[in-house]
Design a protein with these regions (language model features):
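Short alpha-helix immediately C-terminal to the canonical SAM-binding loop
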Residues: 86-88
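Conserved beta-strand/loop positions that form the S-adenosyl-L-methionine
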Residues: 56, 79
Length: 137
């Protein structure tokens, strides 16, 4: 079942810069895009310098927000391509006043141009969709 587009989605996404990073090269050809470097500086992004964990395909953010709540001594970067569900995850993080979680809007294949080598402690893949419907046909 397809989720209904959230009301004022564009405005809400724009107002979420305190929790959101948007991939710049998501529209480029994958092979060209991974050659570009947009490496994230985790010391700049997160308020505290502590280990960074990565969740790919965070959806509505239940795992990421719970992880951040239970582990204040760890940072988590949650990746999601669907802005419609990502805004729900951001809203929940804001409601919980979490300062150790950030969200990256984009697809996983572009991550090598954003994540510095040897900077992630662990990667979590919780029910991420391996084949989006249109590209799998």
């Amino acid at each position: 079942m397809r989720m209904k587009r959230k009301k004022n989605l564009d405005e809400r996404i724009e107002a979420s810069s305190d929790y959101l990073i948007t991939m710049k090269n998501d529209s480029l050809d994958f092979q060209d895009a991974i050659k570009e470097n947009h490496l994230l500086d985790f010391k700049e992004i997160f308020k505290k310098e502590q280990p960074v964990y990565l969740e790919i395909g965070c959806g509505k953010g239940q795992f990421g927000n719970t992880f951040a709540s239970l582990n204040p001594d760890k940072n988590i970067l949650c990746v999601e391509r669907n802005r419609n569900v990502l805004i729900m995850a951001i809203d929940k993080a804001r409601e919980l006043k979490l300062d150790n979680i950030m969200f990256l809007c984009g697809t996983a294949e572009y991550l090598p141009s954003y994540i510095p080598n040897n900077s992630i402690e662990e990667i979590y893949l919780n029910f991420s969709c391996p084949f989006p419907k249109k590209s799998h046909e």
